[in-house]
Amino acid sequence: MTGRKECKGLELSTLSKILLLILPLVVAVLALCIGRLGISPAEVIRSIFGKITGNADLESKNELVLWNIRMPRIILAALVGAGLSVSGCTFQSLFSNPLATPDTVGVSSGTCFGAAVAIFFGADFIVTQAVAFLFGIIAVLLTYLAGSGKGKSLNSVVLAGIMIGSLFSALVSFIKSVADVNSVLPVITFWLMGSFAGAGYHSLMLGAPVMLVGMAVLYVIRWRLNILTLPDDEAKATGTDIKALRAVSVICATAITASCVSMCGQVGWVGLLVPHMCRMKFGNNHVSLLPACISMGMTFMIIVDTVARSATAAEIPISVLTAVIGAPFFIILMRKTGGWQL
């Protein structure tokens, strides 16, 4: 396949597939061991098998910590890491822009505004999650109403997304300015910085299906995503319905991002850093790239969350850590590899 740039990168080798499959699982097991209450890897593995076979002692302190606190956090961290990485990769290909992120079309800002409004009016976590997701979708619809139309290019959508994102960010600032400084403002501020502290099985049941369906659809059509990086005339020559492909890609990536942000707040860098890292290692071919983004995104976010909840007495906001870890790592990676181009 040719285009602006050749889609470099062959099919993943069997060894690479095994490593990408095992890596997040190993990191997840280690994350279950780490925390203020230390649990040995052997005990964690025993507990997992006991849960599967129905022989687990669910009343013990270690079991309660494992299954009621750490497990839902790790599941959510893995889903969010994979989801934001896949969304970032999709948007970068869709807009042929290496700086595109899941917030390019304003979805993160809209979701944050929805959460801020819900928290301002005293909604519980589940309602906040639902309202945040709804406003994320509304933000994307506004972006496409403003940026799409006859004779308009994808750059118009990007510019509209920047404007809509700025509008919702300003509205969030307004909500914070009128919120009660003692009870409401700290909750909004901490939520906006990202945290998995509110993870639970009920919230996962609400948000996880959206993420999983979105990622599954993008995974199934991953080979077609290579076509998005071609000029329009070459893309049409392949016989693919480009408008339909773009629509499906945007809908899936938007739904994934809105669901991620609605469950844990705004998490920066993941949707930019992980796709770049995977492109540098595995090339631009989405057949290999998307599975790599899923695995590396899960691994990265589980590690970040483990540090966030274990490094200090007070939990560190996720976005702080992703920036502190991501920015230097990304700079080093760019200097060593020379970057990548679509």
Residue locations for each model-derived region?
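Alpha-helical transmembrane segments in inner-membrane proteins
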Residues: 2-342
